[in-house]
Amino acid sequence: MKLINCISIALLCTLVDFSSAEITVISNLAVVGSPESHVGTPNKTLYANIQNLWCGAQNLGEHIDVEYGEFTRLSDGKVFKGTVNQGKVYLEIGKASVKVAGRYRCEVRTLDKEIHSGNLIIYMPPVLDFPAAVRVSEVLNARPPHVIGAERRGLHGERMVLECPVLANPEPMVRWEKNGEPLGNSDSIEYDGNNLILNSLTEDHIGKYRCIGDNSFPLFVDGPAIPHQIYFDQDIKVL
């Protein structure tokens, strides 16, 4: 039986293994990615600066050297061999795609050949990761981050899809507004995941649409969950 004991949400977590109760795994538990911008496409990888993850072991508060360690990304099972330095194991990240954000499991092997594990997470505030090339612009120094898309034009009776490809960790919530007001349900609109579909375009669809993506996570030791948002605006015209 195992129990995770998190001493602080941002700096230290221990995982107690009752089969060898003296051994605990320590780690930096959680790090926050800092995106270099807020828009990515297949031709423009969106990078973030991310601190290295690390894990170690201790016995009744005293450091125990580890001889090997690896990190598994839980979203896809991909395994990364860690670098051992001064008895701890590190996953060197630095500048990386925002898509590396998520939950990880660290497994360390101590000198007595025993394996111990703990969980870590890379947080990421909301960004936009488009599936194809787009014409958008970021509002300089906007808080929350604010992205403006190209004007969209459609013919009467056509169907139009407004994308909101928000990427974040934890998983973001997405909501839509039109002309600054929350967009409710009606026969003329529907939702496909985070995307908004305008059915049978009429003059009633004309306006400024905004998708808002938000998530929250703590930024410092024992701190509260801080909300993070991104705005994406699109002007719609009907011809």
UniProtKB/Swiss-Prot annotation:
Keywords on record: Disulfide bond, Glycoprotein, Immunoglobulin domain, Secreted, Signal
Pfam families on file: Ig_3 (PF13927)
Carbohydrate-modified residues: 43
Disruption phenotype: No visible phenotype. No defect in the positioning of ASI and ASH neuron cell bodies. No defect in the positioning of PQV, PVP, RMEV, HSN and AVK axons in the ventral nerve cord.
Expression across tissues: Expressed in body wall muscles.
GO cellular component: extracellular region
UniProt subcellular location: Secreted
Key word Glycoprotein present: yes
Disulphide linkage map: 164-211
Signal peptide: 1-21
Record InterPro entries: Ig-like_dom (IPR007110), Ig-like_dom_sf (IPR036179), Ig-like_fold (IPR013783), Ig_sub2 (IPR003598), IgSF_CEA-related (IPR052598)
Ig-like C2-type domain ranges (all copies): 145-211
Function field: Probably not involved in maintaining the position of ASI and ASH head neuron cell bodies and ventral nerve cord axons of PVQ, PVP, RMEV, AVK and HSN neurons.
Protein name, per record: Zwei Ig domain protein zig-7
Gene encoding the protein: zig-7
